């Protein structure tokens, strides 16, 4: 079977695409997979690194408000759809799968033009424009969260990397602590703003470094590739990294996480059983707050608004949490209990079934 996977721009679209590609190849090694993306997104690097072919279409911004970009959308859409049609006619997929974002719209339109089965996967709690459109063209619709409103939606969860979904944090703990230069006798707060970092999170946690050290809380702080941070690391380590290739080791080293609440982050953090302090990104249509809501409601995390995250808040809240092992254990178990870790294979089977029924 030939499958065309469309998605990219951010890690939120690219990561589940790659996880699904892996699951398709596990379930049916004969599956031929082609990815559709842009030159500007993360997929331009990550898809080839995963050993998958990447076809390029022009970037298609979908403006949320009136303005010059909105006026240019029709011509950009025609160009992107024409490019997607050329790929579809050349690759001849049996099924087209979209993960949302700029790339999915021309993929959906090209698939409909050629009467191909479409599978839509929505990663966020609130669907974006692309997947609202795609869901009107198919009955094969998968969502990550139970309250996402799309026609024909089936909750599959969010596909994540097997490296994460199958990891044993306890078995990796010793290796992880040594890898990052952390002490094994102190609780560890993992701080990350996602693939691009987060200035607000960086400033708030680093500003409370002294209070965290005084409480005996060590920090593993992934600041992002575009951010720098100068924090003195003393007897209680405060480790600053721009990027971490082995997030499984970062999760194994952590006792709790302070992070954004993109769908991929929520799924990975909760899925491995880590309690978290979620700081939703205050843009878009509020989907990050809703992404974290099932975990919060289950007792697996805390939610703090971006504007409320200050060094003072961190100093007043984090030490008490990190030095309470029973509370951490309860929160971790609650988080782990609500996240499906086999979403990659569930979605892959949906894709294979849709393609076979053509």
Report the location of each language-model feature.
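C-terminal alpha-helical cap of glycosyltransferases
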Residues: 340-358
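Short amphipathic alpha-helix
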Residues: 13-25
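A short, well-ordered alpha-helix in the C-terminal region of glycosyltransferases
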Residues: 327-341
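Conserved nucleotide-sugar phosphate-binding/catalytic loop shared by glycosyltransferases and other
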Residues: 3-11, 30-85, 156, 307
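Conserved donor-binding/catalytic loop of nucleotide-activated donor transferases
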Residues: 114, 252-255, 270-279, 298
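Donor-nucleotide binding loops and adjacent catalytic segments primarily
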Residues: 41, 46-50, 172-178, 182-259, ...
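Glycosyltransferases and closely related glycan-assembly transferases
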Residues: 83-96, 104-119, 132-137
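Active-site-proximal region of nucleotide-activated glycan assembly enzymes
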Residues: 112-174
């Amino acid at each position: 079977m030939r499958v065309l996977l469309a998605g990219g721009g951010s890690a939120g679209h690219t990561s589940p695409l790659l996880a699904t590609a892996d699951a398709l190849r596990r379930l049916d090694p004969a599956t031929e997979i082609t990815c559709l993306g842009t030159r500007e997104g993360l997929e331009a690097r990550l898809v080839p690194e995963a050993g998958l072919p990447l076809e390029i279409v022009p970037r298609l911004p979908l403006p949320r408000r009136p303005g010059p970009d909105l006026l240019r959308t029709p011509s950009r859409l025609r160009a992107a759809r024409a490019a997607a049609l050329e790929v579809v006619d050349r690759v001849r997929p049996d099924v087209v799968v979209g993960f949302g974002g700029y790339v999915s719209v021309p993929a959906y339109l090209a698939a409909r033009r050629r009467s191909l089965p479409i599978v839509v996967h929505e990663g966020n709690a609130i669907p974006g424009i692309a997947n609202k459109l795609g869901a009107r063209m198919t009955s094969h619709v998968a969502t990550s969260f139970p309250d996402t409103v799309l026609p024909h939606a089936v909750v599959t969860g969010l596909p994540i990397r097997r490296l994460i979904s199958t990891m044993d944090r306890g078995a990796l703990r010793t290796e992880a602590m040594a890898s990052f230069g952390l002490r094994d006798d102190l609780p560890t707060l993992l701080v990350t703003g996602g693939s691009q970092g987060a200035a607000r999170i960086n400033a708030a946690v680093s500003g409370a470094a002294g209070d965290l050290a005084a409480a005996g809380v060590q920090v593993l702080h992934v600041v992002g590739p575009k951010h720098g941070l100068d924090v003195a690391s003393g007897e209680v380590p405060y480790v600053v990294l721009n990027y971490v290739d082995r997030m499984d080791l970062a999760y194994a080293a952590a006792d709790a996480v302070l992070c954004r609440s993109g769908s991929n982050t929520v799924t990975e953090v909760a899925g491995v059983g880590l309690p978290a302090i979620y700081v939703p990104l205050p843009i878009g249509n509020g989907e990050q707050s809703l992404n974290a809501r099932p975990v919060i409601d289950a007792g697996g995390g805390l939610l703090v608004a971006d504007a409320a995250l200050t060094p003072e808040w961190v100093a007043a809240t984090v030490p008490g949490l990190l030095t309470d092992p029973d509370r951490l254990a309860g929160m971790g178990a609650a988080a782990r209990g609500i996240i499906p870790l086999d979403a990659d294979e569930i979605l892959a089977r949906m894709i294979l079934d849709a393609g076979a029924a053509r």
